[in-house]
């Protein structure tokens, strides 16, 4: 009986400790969607128009060492008056913060990415919210051992390059605020 009692106490302690570890996430581990916008700069970004045939335009948006890609894409969208677009990218980064959306908290849990990683894939879209273009992008990064991590891009620092191919569409897409999630979501019926 004494061994069973000790085993039960040990299991209870393990369960409580595991619960405390999970519940000890700090507020700094999360970011609200409204605070998840661009925070850096991309001074070395270069843009080339690849085609301007009807009805779409194709751009190559190239980032270099140290550029913050999310901020650069936002800058591109504003400078070129993008009202609707989608994009894909490959390249490499040296540090990023990705996010996983927690629907109960209505916040992104930060996923820190440190060191050099391959950008296996990045995709996203650009749509208007309150008359301004807003970039929404996700990224999957590869580790040296072949494992991957991914999520919503909060920030990503390029090293040595990130090659983004952007297709700008002729008809504007609009977003609306969704109070159930605190996210701005594309709404095809919005104008």
Regions from the language model: what does each represent?
Residues 25-60, 64-67, 71-80, 84-88, ...:
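N-terminal intrinsically disordered, cationic/polar leader segments
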Residues 9-19:
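Bacterial N-terminal signal peptides
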Residues 21-23:
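Boundary at the C-terminal end of the N-terminal hydrophobic targeting segment
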Residues 1-9:
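Bacterial N-terminal signal peptides that target proteins for export
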């Amino acid at each position: 009986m004494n061994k069973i009692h000790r085993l039960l106490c040990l299991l209870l302690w393990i369960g409580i400790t595991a619960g405390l570890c999970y519940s000890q996430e700090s507020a700094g581990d999360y970011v609200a969607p409204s605070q998840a916008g661009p925070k850096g700069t991309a001074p070395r970004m270069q843009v080339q128009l690849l085609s301007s045939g009807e009805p779409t335009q194709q751009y190559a948006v190239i980032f270099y060492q140290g550029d913050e890609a999310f901020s650069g894409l936002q800058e591109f969208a504003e400078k070129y008056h993008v009202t609707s677009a989608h994009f894909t990218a490959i390249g490499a980064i040296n540090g990023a913060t990705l996010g996983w959306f927690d629907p109960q908290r209505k916040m992104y849990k930060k996923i820190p990415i440190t060191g050099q990683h391959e950008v296996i894939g990045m995709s996203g879209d650009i749509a208007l919210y309150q008359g301004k273009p807003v970039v929404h992008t996700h990224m999957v990064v590869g580790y040296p051992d072949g494992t991957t991590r991914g999520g919503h891009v909060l920030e990503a620092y390029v090293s040595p390059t990130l090659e983004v191919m952007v297709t700008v569409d002729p008809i504007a897409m609009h977003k609306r605020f969704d109070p159930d999630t605190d996210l701005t979501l594309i709404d095809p019926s919005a104008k």
